[in-house]
Amino acid sequence: MSQQQGYYQQGPPQQGYYQQGPPQQGYYQQGPPQQGYPQQQPVYVQQGQPKEESCLDSCLKCLCCCFLLELVCDN
């Protein structure tokens, strides 16, 4: 029981929950490099601010919904 009390009294780690520093030797983060193929760089997708919807877009969506509802409700 005294070991558990010591654990809880320590509080959260000061550097956060993620391991800091280089990865341990013998482990690859993206697998071993393949010979003859260049290593792929990570692809980052940049999300901009959402575009405002035009009146035409709104009307087309509304018409599609009305059409689908009419098809479903008629049967």
UniProtKB/Swiss-Prot annotation:
Residues 1-43 are annotated as: Disordered. Residues 4-33 are annotated as: 3 X 10 AA tandem repeats of Q-Q-G-Y-Y-Q-Q-G-P-P. It comes from the Eukaryota. Sequence repeats lie at residues 4-13, 14-23, 24-33. It is a lipid-anchor. It holds the Pfam family CYSTM. Coiled coil: none annotated. The keyword Cell membrane applies. Belongs to the CYSTM1 family. This is Lipid-anchored plasma membrane protein CPP2. The gene is CPP2.
